[in-house]
């Protein structure tokens, strides 16, 4: 299957079949009429005197109207949230790269959440910071770094997440309404506040260097319960590369969502949010937060899907960067990525990530 074919799910293919039926229908009808016109005429046996018949007034045809679905929880039809996992180890968000980058599409009409992962090593144009050392390009995760207060390159607000959002929009046409950034310390506290997570790993993840016996860095395949610190370690490991790490991160996010949607936890969410409000960086206000909490009560695990770009459209490369020097990057045809992102914006998702079909959704 070509990369572009992956964009169109079975739902669109079914629509294509329906359109074909409508195209063929006039041809079938005209065929039937032609047969009636060209059939031989029998010799009349009697002349029938016509009688007067009443002319019926045609009944006007009513044009069907489509009733739009209601928008739930007082929210907008769709809300886009940039979710950033920062590798910053301090309590503040003054420095740090974007360790994970997810664009979240929240649908308030057909209650659902979709998360799209962007490779952090994409080499992109970073807008608006050329006056700082002539920087025009960098890795996608550097856009978050340059916008943080420790660098101060971002002069348009929104800190690191704001510059990262503008970079995603500039390069790929991504839409971002709000952002949430979580650093390592905050992530550990959130997982522990939830009582840990239950995850089903489809493969062994071993982050130990040769000769190391640190059991914290070894994760067996299968079901297991993890607390905050080990969950953070698992999220950061990439023994198989960045794409497999993104897959594991999605499994962790899925396990977190599943835990948060439990009735025993859902009613505690306001307390959890209040307890973590000083350790999470976000521009989501009280109104939007209330809308999201309301929608959460209408969701289950089946309403949350993780989608990803097919790995086959990417390749590893190297570039001479003004800051990093000769560095490894991820290369891709930006036009293809823009098409995927546009489909995501519109709610026409491509197939859910295959790696998630391992039991965590059951």
State where each predicted segment sits.
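Non-catalytic, solvent-exposed segments at the cell envelope interface
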Residues: 32-362
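Terminal accessory/targeting
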Residues: 4, 27-30
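N-terminal secretory signal peptides that target proteins for export/translocation
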Residues: 1-12
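Residue-level detector of alpha-helical hydrophobic segments embedded in or interacting with membranes
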Residues: 4-5, 21, 114
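Bacterial N-terminal signal peptides
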Residues: 18-27
């Amino acid at each position: 299957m070509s990369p572009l074919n992956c964009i169109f799910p079975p739902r669109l293919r079914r629509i294509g079949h329906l359109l074909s039926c409508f195209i063929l229908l006039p041809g079938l009808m005209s065929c039937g009429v032609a047969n009636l016109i060209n059939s031989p005429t029998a010799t009349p046996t009697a002349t029938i005197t016509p009688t007067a018949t009443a002319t019926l007034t045609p009944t006007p045809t009513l044009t069907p109207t489509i009733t739009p679905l209601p928008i739930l929880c007082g929210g907008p039809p769709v809300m886009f949230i940039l979710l950033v996992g920062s590798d910053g180890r301090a309590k503040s968000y003054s420095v740090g790269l974007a360790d994970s980058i997810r664009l979240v599409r929240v649908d308030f009409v057909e209650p659902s959440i979709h998360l799209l992962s962007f490779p952090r090593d994409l080499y992109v144009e970073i807008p608006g910071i050329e006056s700082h050392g002539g920087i025009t390009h960098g890795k996608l995760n550097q856009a978050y770094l340059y916008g943080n207060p420790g660098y101060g390159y971002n002069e348009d607000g929104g800190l690191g997440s704001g510059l990262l959002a503008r970079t995603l929009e500039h390069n790929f046409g991504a839409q971002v309404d709000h952002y949430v950034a979580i650093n390592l310390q905050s992530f550990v506290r959130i997982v522990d506040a939830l009582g840990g997570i239950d995850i089903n790993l489809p493969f062994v993840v071993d982050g130990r260097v040769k000769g190391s016996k640190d059991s914290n860095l070894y994760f067996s395949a299968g079901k297991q319960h993890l607390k905050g610190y080990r969950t953070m370690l698992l999220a950061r490991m990439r023994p198989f590369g960045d794409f497999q790490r993104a897959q594991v991160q999605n499994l962790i996010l899925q396990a977190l969502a599943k835990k948060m949607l439990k009735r025993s936890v859902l009613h505690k969410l306001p307390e959890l949010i209040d307890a973590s409000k000083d350790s999470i960086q976000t521009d989501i206000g009280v109104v939007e937060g209330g809308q999201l909490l309301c929608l959460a009560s209408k969701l289950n695990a089946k309403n949350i899907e993780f989608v990803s770009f097919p790995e086959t459209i990417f390749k590893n490369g190297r570039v001479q960067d003004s800051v990093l020097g000769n560095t490894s990057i991820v290369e891709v045809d930006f036009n293809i990525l823009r098409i995927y992102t546009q489909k995501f914006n519109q709610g026409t998702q491509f197939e859910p990530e295959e790696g998630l079909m391992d039991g965590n959704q059951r």
